[in-house]
């Protein structure tokens, strides 16, 4: 996973480079392939500085918690076999992704900086708000699936991907994951023009690298979960042996879409971000959820 995260940073820089008519990293190694390793070495051998006024334990614990949670979410994911086949796999994913808010809040509070605290409060409000729609979307999918276990989703989608009947949910989930992972155009927590670097402004060296790894691991996990929920995960009728490769290709395509959006769109204003959720996404997801509750009840009289 960490290797995938390392090369995702390289792919991002390459894609953004080509979109802006330049090469991207091309000095370290052939075609710049060793750039992530060089970045990691540079960050981890630097001295981890911290402000004198910061709260030392919380300051150090926040990045460790962020990375630990980002790697813990992978436990119940079927790829094609999960590490632990949990009965309530989806609830586990939802609860662990909700806990990631604490690492951001701790880092902003412990830094003892106005910029960091403002960025952290924005991040918390944004993440908690979008968690609501993500939870309702997961509930709707579970109503179709009939179980909270992630592995049963492959059986559900054996004949048709769930993206076909539930495409509004897929679109709202994709945009919500952009906001959940603090990516452009919703990267208000790291608004360079106004907050320098957001909640991690006081971090350097190793702890900063841990936040960086956690952010990109979250991007991959969110896209992997979207693939499992809507795109039949690893199911390919004519090539069942290539299950993991198929799953990885779909995840990579969604991740590339993340990067494409980053290169194309400017940053949202904060009130627009909240209006988009509370006035647009929440009604859409609630109505769709009610529809999936009513449909089986309405059709239950048919023998």
From Swiss-Prot:
It holds the Pfam family NADHdh. It catalyses: a ubiquinone + NADH + 5 H(+)(in) = a ubiquinol + NAD(+) + 4 H(+)(out). It comes from the Eukaryota. This is NADH-ubiquinone oxidoreductase chain 1. It is found in: Mitochondrion inner membrane. Keywords: Electron transport, Membrane, Mitochondrion, Mitochondrion inner membrane, NAD, Respiratory chain, Translocase, Transmembrane, Transmembrane helix, Transport, Ubiquinone. InterPro entries: NADH_UbQ_OxRdtase_su1/FPO (IPR001694), NADH_UbQ_OxRdtase_su1_CS (IPR018086). Core subunit of the mitochondrial membrane respiratory chain NADH dehydrogenase (Complex I) which catalyzes electron transfer from NADH through the respiratory chain, using ubiquinone as an electron acceptor. Essential for the catalytic activity and assembly of complex I. Core subunit of respiratory chain NADH dehydrogenase (Complex I) which is composed of 45 different subunits. The keyword Transferase does not apply. Its EC number is 7.1.1.2. The chain crosses the membrane at residues 56-76, 88-108, 132-152, 159-179, 219-239, 241-261, 282-302. It comes from Zaglossus bruijni (Western long-beaked echidna). GO terms for molecular function: NADH dehydrogenase (ubiquinone) activity. Disulfide bonds: none annotated. Belongs to the complex I subunit 1 family. One of its GO terms (biological process) is mitochondrial electron transport, NADH to ubiquinone.
């Amino acid at each position: 996973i960490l290797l995938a995260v390392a090369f995702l940073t390289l792919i991002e820089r390459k894609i953004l480079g080509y979109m802006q008519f330049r090469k991207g990293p091309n000095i370290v190694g052939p075609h710049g392939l060793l750039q992530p390793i060089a970045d990691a070495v540079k960050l981890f051998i630097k001295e981890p500085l911290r402000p004198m006024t910061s709260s030392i334990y919380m300051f150090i614990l926040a990045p460790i918690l962020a990375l630990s949670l980002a790697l813990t979410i992978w436990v119940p994911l079927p790829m094609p076999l999960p590490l632990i086949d949990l009965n309530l796999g989806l609830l586990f994913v939802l609860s662990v992704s909700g806990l990631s808010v604490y690492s951001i809040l701790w880092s902003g509070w412990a830094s003892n900086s106005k910029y960091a605290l403002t960025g952290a409060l924005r991040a918390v409000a944004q993440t908690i708000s979008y968690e609501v729609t993500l939870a309702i979307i997961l509930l709707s999918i579970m109503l179709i699936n009939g179980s909270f276990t992630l592995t049963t989703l492959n059986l559900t989608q054996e004949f048709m991907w769930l993206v076909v009947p539930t495409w509004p949910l897929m679109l709202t989930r994709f945009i919500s994951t952009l906001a959940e992972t603090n990516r452009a155009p919703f990267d208000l927590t790291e608004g360079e023009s106004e907050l320098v670097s957001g909640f991690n402004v006081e971090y350097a060296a190793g702890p900063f690298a841990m936040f960086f790894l956690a952010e990109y691991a979250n991007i991959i996990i969110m896209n992997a979960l979207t693939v499992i929920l809507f795109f039949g995960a690893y199911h390919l009728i004519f090539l069942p042996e290539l299950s993991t490769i198929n799953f990885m290709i779909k995840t990579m395509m969604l991740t590339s879409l993340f990067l494409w959006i980053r290169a194309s769109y400017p940053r949202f204003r904060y009130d627009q971000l909240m209006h988009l959720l509370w006035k647009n996404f929440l009604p859409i997801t609630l109505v769709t959820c009610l529809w999936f509750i009513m449909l089986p009840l309405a059709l239950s009289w048919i023998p």
